[in-house]
């Protein structure tokens, strides 16, 4: 054996892919080699002119060691900066059994409720926490961050309000990052933001108002009177409230507000250089059909038992399309679960103890400073002590002394410095900070402390009284509760999830390990730049890789979801055209097959959507595109196009599409949802795209987390780069530094970027190209095998598809009465999550197997769908009645087969339809959920405990 053969830097690619299956898969699709297969699948006109310019792969061990070296360049000071981000303690039982558990982080958004009851219960727990703390009857299952939530509240206020005004009031005490995002959104909604002292809010006519509770500099104001005066005028009032402070303070609902929002980060989610974190959003009942994001509701299943589901989906962007005022899809489910479980584990007494300790430490510190003659700016505060030193020189000295002692403070202005206390603050911190603020080594802190919150501000009602917050306070009980919920969900640690357009690929353990390293997780997003050298190097590495992959000139990492990436890309186009004196360009062409976020995003930017027809092959109708581009030539802003198409085909006319748009004065936005079918074989910038968003949670291995987090960075051509999101508090060292932002943190959900860095580093240039080839091969193998039983709706060159295929169930439905939903639910009995149902074509399933699945797993999935086809035939032949068969009754639970049985099919046919199912049976926890009942009888709070027990 040669010495070089002892070391294989490409070992990870062999873990991510199944090289041993290559010959069999190629033979099944009628090809002799992978090169021949790709050549017969991909149009020659779009092939990359050169190979991928990425480094060679590193082994798992070497990649982890290299990343550890990069991470070590970050400096972990004790953070007292505040501004919505605080050090917290993640309970270890939650860290290990949720955040680090593939049973939680590899699941998808709970569209298939019957196999997501555990996650849905966890999300419902979160909603109940928000309901209890805000005082409102309805809360959603998270938004992307506090700044985005504030912008969503502004849009919702305009939608539901009665005041005929385009002016929105913003409390001057609002976090600067929140105001920055609101400025971005307000401009294209046509709103005027008026920023002023909170007490002056009722001096004008506003359709809505936003107050900060607690203020950015720490003060707590009694907002009840000013809110009352605004309400008398019909203004919709939102309150951005610190989640931990609400444990002690009156709820926003009691203050008279209509909407409450904020960040739940300090409920056990690391700061992570800005994210990901789950924002909460709660509101009055009458606004429930106008609220953004997901809402979990209690319904019932076919047997009449309680069951959970995502409620009121008809108000969401994928239904409302260009009529939507929000493009939010899934948000931050995994972080939502962390925050909700934090409340479950600590319970009401625990969270009160934590909140009281934070407030008491801040009060002790303030009292000591006052007794030493210093001026504490605010008499009433929760956690943040702001001191005015009267001179810039003294403030500089204090700030520097704290920094030298390992503490990051916030510089409020030239003379003021603030220290924000938090869950991890300890007695030694008081001593160190006192020394930095006063220059004295001797100190005495009072043992009996009077808090700084006035009695009239304090909460009088009880919180977290539901049994779920009062039952799991020992670790073994919490561990079992988490395991119980996990076992009710089907995630990728059980079987493949073939959701089309979702790219549910392997989330390798080595990729996940670094996200909990303290060097990445414990950094404040506004920490001094000198302390974030590791993150900056990570970002630079990734920017170079993504530029090489896509062909673009610049990358912005700020968008913290795919929908935000869409918005940011189209925003860059709008800003560019305005800078060119072409603000009048307001027409956006969108193919009929586009995802619902596309028209929703266009509408949010003040664009008028013009739909472009598709032809009989599912491709963009070039003639219709050309006619509409020329018709709107003087007003054409952009086209939003997905490639490969949403129909799973490489459209050969993509260069012509881009050329037609450019010739008529427009820009090309490419939706990167299907980028997994491009890497190493084509580049979006090279075929004509001007901007692209990339789903790191699809193509680049960040897990879907059961509904988030995601990341949607954008790649831009040089002319658009100056118009990407900037940031008001962080120097991004980019051409777009002066622009307003789209997210609260400059680099979005930065702490999950190490996942993608590890994937790129371990795969290397050869592995990344192989991944694309295998994604195509697996998809074509599945399509070929299934075409024996089902029509494949669209194909491209040589009858091939790209990375996903659409199975047409409409003929079968017409003949048998069995619906696409019946087949989706029946797959659960075989142990599989359904593919994407009725998108982009009603009555179909869209299947994307990804490159990660082995032939053995693909064959099991194919066998399940073939078996289901035989079951449908039994209905057609009259062997089973149309109203009583295993498809319409699916899914079947353990309770079904142990109870009375009067069906014309056997128990074995119901739950063990194929031999492989016996080896690893997944039992759905509930029967088919009644969606109509759930929407007509919306309950989005935790039901009584006996419902769980039954």
Curated annotation (Swiss-Prot):
Keywords noted in UniProt: Oxidoreductase, Pyridoxal phosphate
One cellular-component annotation, GO: cytosol
InterPro entries the UniProt entry points to: GcvP (IPR003437), GDC-P_C (IPR049316), GDC-P_N (IPR049315), GDC_P (IPR020581), PyrdxlP-dep_Trfase (IPR015424), PyrdxlP-dep_Trfase_major (IPR015421), PyrdxlP-dep_Trfase_small (IPR015422)
Entry GO MF terms: glycine binding; glycine dehydrogenase (decarboxylating) activity; pyridoxal phosphate binding
EC assignment: 1.4.4.2
Residues modified to N6-(pyridoxal phosphate)lysine: 698
GO terms for biological process, alphabetical: glycine decarboxylation via glycine cleavage system
Catalytic reaction(s) noted: N(6)-[(R)-lipoyl]-L-lysyl-[glycine-cleavage complex H protein] + glycine + H(+) = N(6)-[(R)-S(8)-aminomethyldihydrolipoyl]-L-lysyl-[glycine-cleavage complex H protein] + CO2
Cofactor(s), by name: pyridoxal 5'-phosphate
The keyword NADP is assigned to this record: no
EC category: oxidoreductase
Source domain of life: Bacteria
UniProt-listed Pfam families: GcvP2_C (PF21478), GDC-P (PF02347)
Subunit relationships: The glycine cleavage system is composed of four proteins: P, T, L and H.
Protein role: The glycine cleavage system catalyzes the degradation of glycine. The P protein binds the alpha-amino group of glycine through its pyridoxal phosphate cofactor; CO(2) is released and the remaining methylamine moiety is then transferred to the lipoamide cofactor of the H protein.
The family this protein is said to belong to: Belongs to the GcvP family.
HAMAP family given in the database record: GcvP
Protein name: Glycine dehydrogenase (decarboxylating)
Naturally occurring in which organism (per UniProt): Neisseria gonorrhoeae (strain NCCP11945)
